[in-house]
Amino acid sequence: MAAGRELVVSFGEMLIDFVPTVAGVSLAEAPAFLKAPGGAPANVAIAVSRLGGGAAFVGKLGDDEFGRMLAAILRDNGVDDGGVVFDSGARTALAFVTLRADGEREFMFYRNPSADMLLTADELNVELIKRAAVFHYGSISLIAEPCRTAHLRAMEIAKEAGALLSYDPNLREALWPSREEARTQILSIWDQADIVKVSEVELEFLTGIDSVEDDVVMKLWRPTMKLLLVTLGDQGCKYYARDFHGAVPSFKVQQVDTTGAGDAFVGALLQRIVKDPSSLQDEKKLVESIKFANACGAITTTKKGAIPSLPTEAEVLQLIEKA
């Protein structure tokens, strides 16, 4: 990671989540919906900024009311939107989210195609990407061309400029043509990443084994990686670095909505790594950073919606002190 740079650049989709006003009902039974800005890479960028870090977003939005609203939300939250482009021929993506009684989610997407899928390599803000200390992305941008090619090119540009590459696959099975295609494409860029974060569900999906034991996790380890993380919801997180591995417990909170918790975790961790890259080699520092990220994720589950519930540094430190 190049010295003196503290910018996290997030690449991918930003969309509108429609969340039912009542938890525990199907989409058809929901009496009404609240619109909430979402999209994992955008959530990560805002999480970084909310914590006082430098963040930018690269992606495509529809040249429509929702797209303009989302760009304004990035700016209002201190995220550099110099990498955002608009498409007059496609709409901003929508997702209808079912909140089960336990706060977990199910999704129904409207993308045929949506603007985020139509970003081309020529539309990339190369200078912005080159400034990244960390370049973060998911796998949804790998599903369709031309966005897939733009994604691969952006990774190349960032890597050549000295950025750490951070990958959260953020599996959304409903968006892929098949489970096999999802697995193949998600793993197609696995070897390039420096930092990878997966959930329990993604670990099972990618390995075919329903276990979080070390030998299963190590199937996803690559010698080129600096850090592999497995998030375990309210059970905390397991971490694997070149010279050490372990687990960090979570914080007990009253969960309302898990939307954005993983993104808050990633944003918090990346913000800490950018501030002190040596934490990737220093277990004590890394554990402190993961603890901070766990607290950030936990707070995010205590309110509805991702972006409104992303905490400030003061709120995170308050939870850590209370615990």
Swiss-Prot record:
Control of this protein's activity is summarized as: Inhibited at high fructose.
Q: Which residues form a coiled coil?
A: none
Mind telling me which Gene3D superfamilies this protein's record contains? 3.40.1190.20
Specify the superkingdom.
Eukaryota
Nucleotide-binding: present as a keyword of the record?
Answer: yes
CDD domains of this UniProt entry? bac_FRK (cd01167)
State the EC number(s).
Answer: 2.7.1.4
Record keywords: Membrane included?
no
PROSITE patterns the UniProt entry points to = PFKB_KINASES_1 (PS00583), PFKB_KINASES_2 (PS00584)
Tissue-level expression: Expressed in stems, at higher levels in roots, and hardly detectable in leaves.
Which terms are listed as keywords in the entry? ATP-binding, Carbohydrate metabolism, Kinase, Nucleotide-binding, Transferase
- Gene Ontology biological process terms in this record: fructose metabolic process; starch biosynthetic process
Q: In which pathway does it act?
A: Glycan biosynthesis; starch biosynthesis
Q: What cystine pairs are annotated?
A: none
User: What catalytic activity does the UniProt entry give for this protein?
Assistant: D-fructose + ATP = D-fructose 6-phosphate + ADP + H(+)
Enzyme class, spelled out: transferase
Identify the InterPro entries for this entry: Carboh/pur_kinase_PfkB_CS, PfkB_Carbo_kinase, PfkB_dom, Ribo/fructo_kinase, Ribokinase-like
The Gene Ontology CC terms held by the record are: cytosol
* Gene Ontology molecular-function annotations: ATP binding; fructokinase activity
What's this protein's family per the entry?
Belongs to the carbohydrate kinase PfkB family.
Function description:
May play an important role in maintaining the flux of carbon towards starch formation in endosperm. May also be involved in a sugar-sensing pathway.
Protein name stated in the entry: Fructokinase-1
The species is: Zea mays
